[in-house]
C-alpha cells in the first residue's frame, strides 16, 4: 500500500515554465500541494493567468536554477522540483546534479535524458520497441523521421525518403 503524504501544504511542487509545466502544476494543485513556477521573465504574462500557480521565481534564463538565490528560495518554500526536458536542454548533467534542492526522481538519470545514445541504450535494455536508428544519411532506404540534435517541443524534425531528400 502506498504511503500517503499527510501534510501536503507543507510541500511545494516546482518546475520550469515550459511546455508541460501547466499539466504538472495543475495536477499538483488538484492533489492539494502548493505550486511554484520557475519562469523566464519574458514569459511571465502567459503564466500569471493561471490561478493554480501559487508562486513564481523569475529568471532571465533557466540555467539560473543552479544559482544560490534560486536554490535558497526553492528550499525556503520546501520545494520538490519536478525535472522536465527543458532543464536538460539548458544545463549540463553536472550542473543539474550540483543543485542542492530535492528533485522528484533521480538527478543522475537525467544524464540519460541528455545523451541520445544513453537514452537509446536505456530503452533497448528495457526491451522497449523502438524505431530503427539510421546512423548516416547514406543509409536512409525508406521514409524516415529525422530528429536534429537539440530538437524539442515538436520542432527540429523532418521527413526524408533518402539521402537526397535529407539534404533538401
Outline where the language-model segments fall:
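Short active-site oxyanion
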Residues: 10-13, 34-35, 77-81
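Short internal beta-strands
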Residues: 33-42
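Glycine-rich, phosphate-binding/catalytic loops in enzymes
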Residues: 31-32, 98-100, 162-164
